[in-house]
């Protein structure tokens, strides 16, 4: 086979030099035709769109052609010509074909519809489908948008540890990391497990958040962001939870809660616009196939300012809805940690646009959030989105050493684990704020997928760590 430089299909479909000899490589989606001519739909993953390969059967070995089945990988040299059919401007008239990889007849991705549940069972193959090709190209583009946004605003990308000795959320739902023999655990004089001989000499876990370390960096570099995997051992089998997911966590010195809200709104609008501008074909495919209102919803986020609403006012709206006959599964009262149904009511039915809820009761928020003067609420914020509920959680951080100490004691967090964090309040403390965005929550919104397991390549959930 003549050596010709490969052209990606995404680039080929934009070319206008009709008559050029080209090489394309990819996987066969379908093959159809007559006794004289076959048409192969070829895809290489660079785009949702296939290129049609026109094969004059008289010019090729019959035994080789039998190997070209759905899923097979082939290389084609041919002439780029104007397409006589609808759907795309160009196609390739094959001159040479090489089968790079045959596909066994047990290949599960034949030309028919497959349920999302079935595709999760073959997560190693599902990126080859149109749906997951689109989702994972969008995932890549969202990652690019995140780095681009913060870089353009002068933030520094800061790497926080995956293995940690602290629990940022105070939730205790952490995966432990140990090299100890689990069948012969050493106990101390109180009967508790002794970690003296463990690798780190202390109890260690996979991180639930890089926020605390990010705060340290912000008090030195001014503005930083983290973007990496986080882990939570929540035994939650829901369409909204993963045990392993990715978080984006900016921290900014000298920002108050209002600045934090401005940054969150600007950031998420930037990401949504990036998807519409740079993933148009993939977004349109998902809109047409899964969620007819997807594009309209994405455009709506860009059009309207987010509502900024104190928690207390939000509770009043929900209580009024109940009084008028609206049924919620979970009760509504001041002090409750709002359920997804409450958040979505505010966004989808009352305001019909994203909402930033602020000034939550301190009892339902983390120790590091700055207290308001009323002594009952903290300067927290949650960004609520249609179909998703909470997509961002953040706050102005408590900068006062004594107030932070008191809050740590109230929540019974071991002081020995917090000395390094408290040092930043002793040595040149400053106002600062930040937030966390679950990357997969953002992807749920941008792709229109209904289950968070379908926006990450290999979901980690209770009883599931395959691949």
UniProtKB/Swiss-Prot annotation:
CDD domains attached to this UniProt entry: AsxRS_core (cd00776), EcAsnRS_like_N (cd04318)
Any one GO MF annotation of this record: ATP binding
Keyword hit for Cell division: no
Cellular localisation: Cytoplasm
InterPro entries: Aa-tRNA-synt_II, aa-tRNA-synth_II, aa-tRNA-synth_II/BPL/LPL, Asn-tRNA-ligase, Asp/Asn-tRNA-synth_IIb, NA-bd_OB-fold, NA-bd_OB_tRNA
EC numbers on record: 6.1.1.22
Record's keyword annotation contains Cytoplasm: yes
Keyword tags: Aminoacyl-tRNA synthetase, ATP-binding, Cytoplasm, Ligase, Nucleotide-binding, Protein biosynthesis
Family: Belongs to the class-II aminoacyl-tRNA synthetase family.
Protein name: Asparagine--tRNA ligase
Species assigned in the record: Bacteroides thetaiotaomicron (strain ATCC 29148 / DSM 2079 / JCM 5827 / CCUG 10774 / NCTC 10582 / VPI-5482 / E50)
């Amino acid at each position: 086979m003549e050596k010709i430089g490969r052209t990606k299909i995404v680039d080929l479909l934009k070319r206008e030099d009709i008559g050029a000899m080209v090489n394309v490589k990819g996987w066969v989606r379908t093959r159809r035709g007559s006794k004289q001519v076959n048409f192969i739909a070829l895809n290489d993953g660079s785009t949702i769109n296939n290129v049609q390969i026109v094969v004059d059967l008289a010019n090729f070995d019959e035994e080789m052609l039998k190997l070209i089945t759905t899923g097979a990988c082939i290389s084609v040299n041919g002439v780029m010509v104007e397409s006589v059919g609808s759907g795309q401007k160009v196609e390739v008239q094959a001159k040479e074909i090489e089968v790079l990889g045959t596909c066994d007849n047990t290949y599960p991705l034949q030309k028919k519809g497959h349920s999302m549940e079935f595709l999760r069972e073959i997560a190693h193959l599902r990126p080859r489908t149109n749906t997951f090709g689109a989702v994972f190209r969008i995932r890549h583009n969202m990652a690019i948008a995140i780095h681009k946004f913060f870089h353009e605003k002068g933030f520094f990308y800061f790497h926080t540890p995956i293995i940690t000795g602290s629990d940022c959320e105070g939730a205790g739902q952490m995966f432990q990391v140990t090299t100890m023999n689990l069948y012969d655990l050493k106990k101390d004089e109180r009967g508790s497990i002794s970690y003296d001989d463990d690798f780190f000499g202390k109890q260690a876990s996979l991180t639930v958040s890089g926020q605390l370390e990010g705060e340290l960096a912000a008090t030195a570099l001014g503005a930083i962001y983290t973007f990496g995997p986080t882990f939570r051992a929540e035994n939650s089998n829901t369409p909204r939870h993963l045990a392993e997911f990715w978080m984006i966590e900016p921290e900014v010195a000298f920002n108050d809660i209002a600045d934090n809200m401005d940054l969150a709104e600007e950031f998420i609008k930037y990401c949504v616009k990036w998807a519409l501008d740079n993933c148009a074909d993939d977004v349109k495919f998902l809109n047409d196939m899964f969620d007819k209102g997807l594009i309209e919803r994405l455009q709506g986020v860009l059009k309207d300012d987010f509502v900024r609403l104190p928690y207390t006012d939000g509770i009043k709206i929900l209580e009024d809805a109940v009084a008028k006959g609206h049924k919620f599964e979970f009760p509504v009262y001041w002090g409750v940690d709002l359920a997804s149904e409450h958040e979505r009511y505010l966004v989808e039915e009352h305001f019909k646009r994203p909402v930033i809820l602020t000034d939550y009761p301190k009892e339902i928020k983390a120790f590091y959030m700055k207290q308001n003067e009323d002594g009952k609420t903290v300067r927290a914020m949650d960004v609520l989105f249609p179909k998703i509920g909470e997509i961002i959680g953040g706050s102005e951080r408590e900068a006062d050493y004594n107030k932070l100490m008191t809050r740590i004691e109230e929540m019974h967090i071991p002081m020995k684990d917090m000395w390094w964090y408290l040092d930043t309040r002793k040595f040149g403390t400053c106002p600062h704020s930040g937030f966390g965005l679950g990357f997969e929550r953002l992807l749920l919104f941008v792709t229109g997928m209904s289950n968070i397991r379908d926006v990450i390549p290999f979901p980690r959930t209770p009883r599931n760590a395959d691949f």
